[in-house]
Amino acid sequence: MSRRGDRPRTPAQPRKKARVDQPRSARTRRTRVSEAEAGLRSSSFVFRHRTGNLAILAVLVIAAVQLFMLQVPRAAGLRAEAASQLKVTDITPAIRGSIIDRNNDKLAFTIEARALTFQPTRVRKQLDEAWRKAQEAGSSTSDDVPNPDERLNEIAKEIAARLNNTPDAKTVLKKLKSNETFVYLARAVDPAIANAITDKFPEVGSERQDLRQYPGGSLAANIVGGIDWDGHGLLGLEDSLDAVLAGTDGSVTYDRGSDGVVIPGSYRNRHDAVDGSTVQLTIDDDIQYHVQQQVQMAKDASGAKNVSAVVLDAKTGEVLAMSNDNTFDPSQDIGRQADRQMGNPSVSSPFEPGSVNKIVTAAAAIENGLTNPDEVLQVPGSIHMGGVTVRDAWNHGVMPYTTTGVFGKSSNVGTLMLAQRVGPERFYEMLRKFGLGQRTNVGLPGESSGLLPPIDQWSGSSFSNLPIGQGLSMTLLQMAAMYQTVANDGVRVPPRIIKSTIAPDGTVTEEERPEGIRVISPETARTLRSMFRSVVQRDPMGVQQGTGPQAAVEGYQIAGKTGTAQQINPACGCYYDDVYWITFAGIAPADDPRYVIGIMMDAPQRAADGSPGSSAAPLFHEIASWLLQRHNVPLSPDPGPPLTLQAT
């Protein structure tokens, strides 16, 4: 039985320590601090987490935008850029057409040549790198790799030796050691020599650079012109006909891998080169050579500033020769020939012709029936006309000159007397018919039209100057064309110098022949040719002698006219008293015209042959006699009756 108060025993519980109660306020503060610290730690973690996420998101957005830009808007451009890094276009230069004379002799043609090239900075870097690696690898390897300096010296010596020391080794070496990215070591190199050099020295490059040849040197250079180093026309016909001569380059495009190997099947856009056409001229290189020689000799003998001469075919107006002194040589460096004549004065430099122009007055008077060759005019020593007094070149009283004699003796007064009969309007019309004040359109660059004042701009003195060849200007070609009209029975055929164009396939296209222009009747032309024989007529007594007997050619009838015109002094706008243009224009033979020759001398001190005076007639004689003999022109069957210049 149990006792009261007895209870079941439980395991013993550890005794709790006695708690010491603290004040309530202290406990509260401690609790709040702990909670605050926990809150701060939690907020910092959240901030860092969010910031990190935002940064990652921003990077992903930027990457996505860049990827989008690469794949969509810039994709085409990038593909094109990548393709261009692989794409290569090779150019095949067209061969420039030749320029030939009327007999197919070449005045200019092209031969294949090479230019030796080098990339100094790139090649030297490669040589230095190869040498360094060889040295590091050991002597056995370095024996197979050239020393960079020695290699460059070998290249320079090889090029100089094969090119006859032009350029020399020192010059080549200087280019090899330059800091340029690209240089030309030599130009105009024979392809075989260029190949030998590049085979031995792969560091040297070779590019095609065709060479223009001018076998005659300065022969006809004033007509043919020249080209620059890039093969483009620079002067003369080489320039004005550049599009015809140059042709069209060929090309082919292909892709090349990073290793430089052509990617198979990538060839495209293939265009074959079309070579330039050949241009045939009307000139005869033999005549051109002779005339050019004679012109230079006349310049040296006379002390003139310049001398020019033109030879035309009397019937067709074709230019057979056109020469001036001191002509440049297109086969040499044009840039070093500043003292040479680069232009073509025969078409580009007009001058006052002087008495050569009197043939217009004669033509107008004869054509209009206002005189005849044998009419005797009482010619005084001077004439007052248009407010000015004009005198003859020599003092004389009233002289009984025939119309023939007026022109044979070149009387200014007699010419103006006849011009008064013609009148200003008919005289001006005749000047225009003869082509003055108008370009001939011969086909040469830089042609001048000369100066012919319109009749409504004439001053009071114009009509006293123009009939005697002052107050207007013309080119030498225009002057010769006037006399071609008389030689061709009154029909002016505008001169031309381009005969035909020959395509690469051999197709010949003849240059269109200019249409003839009737200026005077055949009867007037024949009368003028007979009258103007008086100019070259000799007379031991001097009474019936003309002003240019030195122009005569034994056995042939020659018609022509001398000219002397005062030059203008730019300082005062007035005429010099002692500086002249000296001219001569003539027809050979006069009875059956074959050639028309025009000559201009600028301020000569002596005659063309060095004799006293200032006549161009001796130069005409030299050219005309050579032409007639060279082409076996038959002698004139009738030397013609003596002409009366002065009535007795």
Curated annotation (Swiss-Prot):
Gene designation per UniProt: pbpB
Organism, as annotated: Mycolicibacterium smegmatis (strain ATCC 700084 / mc(2)155)
The protein, known as: Penicillin-binding protein PbpB
Keyword Cell cycle appears in the UniProt entry: no
Chain residue ranges for the region called Disordered: 1-35
GO molecular function annotations of the record: penicillin binding
Active-site residue list: S355
Chief localization: membrane
Membrane topology designation: Single-pass membrane protein
